[in-house]
Amino acid sequence: MEQLAAALLAWITAHSDLETRSLPLPEIVLMSPQTLTREYYHGAPHLIPTDGVDDRLNALYAAEDGPHGTIYTLAPAHIDGAEDFDDPADNPLFREILLHELVHHAQWQTGQPVGWACQSQGEKDAYHLGGQYLKELRITDPIPNRNFWAHMYSLC
């Protein structure tokens, strides 16, 4: 997973103004949908959906967890299309999810949030870069209206 994260960080540097070459890698924790849901709702367990899974969650970045931040993500086998790959981590949809969280890692590690009105402002770049990554690979984007959602999720 470290090699994949390093390659995706290099892609981020090549396609944005984020300089990632000297950044430490975050810890990457692969999880089941149930475990990721519990991680997300750890401060408010009464809000966990009754079936134990929030289907909207793919991954989370926690800047203050671990020595250099932690990405909690669905294990590759849980991502749509995983069965089409000998190694589910080769699935471009999994890689885009990881790339999205690595954008947040780069934002936090380079101090960008200091100038933001709220943490949500980092979503626009993460969504746009994820869409660009999929487009480069000629993969159908699973998020219809990505630009709309990038805008909505970045509002404070």
Name these PLM-found stretches.
Residues 41-92:
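Active-site scaffold of zinc-dependent metalloenzymes
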Residues 72-73, 105-107, 128:
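Structural recognition of the beta-strand scaffold that forms the well-ordered cores
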Residues 117-152:
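Post-HExxH zinc-binding segment in Zn-dependent metallohydrolases
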Residues 1-56:
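A metal-dependent hydrolase signature that marks the N-terminal structural subdomain at the beginning
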Residues 2-3, 88-97, 116-124:
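Soluble non-cytosolic domains of exported or imported proteins
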Residues 155-156:
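Short, solvent-exposed mixed-charge patches
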Residues 96-109:
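Active-site recognition of the HExxH zinc-binding catalytic motif
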Residues 113:
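Short, contiguous alpha-helical
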